[in-house]
Amino acid sequence: GLGDVYKRQEVDIKEAVRIHFRDIGQDESVHDVTYENGQARERTQILMDIANKNNGMVIGTGDMSELALGWATYNGDHMSMYGVNASVPKTLVRHLVHYYADTCGNKELSTVLYDVLDTPVSPELLPPENGKIAQKTEDIVGPYELHDFYLYYVMRFGFAPAKIYRLAQVAFEGQYDNAVILKWLKTFYRRFFSQQFKRSCLPDGPKVGTVAVSPRGDLRMPSDASVRILSLIHISEPTRLRRIS
């Protein structure tokens, strides 16, 4: 693995971030978006500088699900020198990691990968609670299996929200009730529109599936597109359907 070629290195960002917070007048006890993003951007700066130092490149870890929802810090983990996972949805990432853990033949590596799979998805930008991860992504933005379902039918077929809502009711029957499906469908559209500005300046990356959100590929969308326009036309349809379902 890469760890056999390159020396493992851990860089503590605490002091650098604290100095930065003091410089901009950020209260460290206020765990707001500045508190979170300051850490994310410090991580990226370190990675970029280490890459320069070693004549290398920063490989982005963000996947298509995160890009669709804008679940990335602008100029933080949003930025890299090559976004290798840019067209791989989060649900597929899990399967790929599990497959490699099963087949790699390296027991030590497999143990680490299984542990990663058992860990809640999180940017870990907030202090832990009782020694456990407090910031769980799917508690905040919703289940990735729902969002990946929505994304596929939006990008591959261009279906309207009402149709996607009906399809999700069938696909996830017994797993999510109608109210939950509707809640996260609205979240998906709100974030998909409002976060286009992050996708408009994505690093290069491959397209490996049937859909992608790169501005140089499948998705050409203005950053100032308003979800309000869509909501006036379509987003109320699932609410009407919920009343009659």
Which role fits each region the language model picked out?
Residues 4-232, 236, 245:
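ATP/NTP-dependent adenylation/nucleotidyl-transfer catalytic domains that generate, transfer
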Residues 241:
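Extended, polar beta-sheet/loop recognition surfaces of beta-rich domains
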